[in-house]
Amino acid sequence: MARMVFCKKYQQELEGLALPPMPGARGKELFETVSKKAWQEWLQHQTMLINEKRLNLMDPDARTYLTEQMEKFLNNENFDAAEGFVPKD
């Protein structure tokens, strides 16, 4: 049976991640509060941001920006979108 979590993005019980997505306290918190569905959506959005804004992940400012966007995305706050992107209905 899949591990279930109360997803902070969708505000409902959904299947959780198999492993923490990153090390440390932040990874543990995400593991306990973010669903597999929300995390997969974030990864897709993150890829769009990296490509659209041509972010260099070796740059600490780019990593900070992505971390801020991740928090906004997962907390249903206003987050940056790729220019011209129209989400599927």
Curated annotation (Swiss-Prot):
Q: Which molecular function terms from Gene Ontology are attached?
A: iron ion binding
Q: Which is one Pfam family of this protein?
A: Iron_traffic
Which biological process terms from the Gene Ontology are attached to this UniProt entry?
Answer: cellular response to oxidative stress
Gene3D superfamilies referenced in this protein's UniProt entry, alphabetically: Fe(II) trafficking protein YggX (1.10.3880.10)
- Annotated GO CC locations: cytosol
Keywords in alphabetical order, please: Iron
Regions annotated as coiled coil: none
Q: Which family does it belong to?
A: Belongs to the Fe(2+)-trafficking protein family.
**Biological role:** Could be a mediator in iron transactions between iron acquisition and iron-requiring processes, such as synthesis and/or repair of Fe-S clusters in biosynthetic enzymes.
Tell me what this protein is called: Probable Fe(2+)-trafficking protein
Organism of origin: Hahella chejuensis (strain KCTC 2396)
Taxonomic lineage:
Bacteria, Pseudomonadati, Pseudomonadota, Gammaproteobacteria, Oceanospirillales
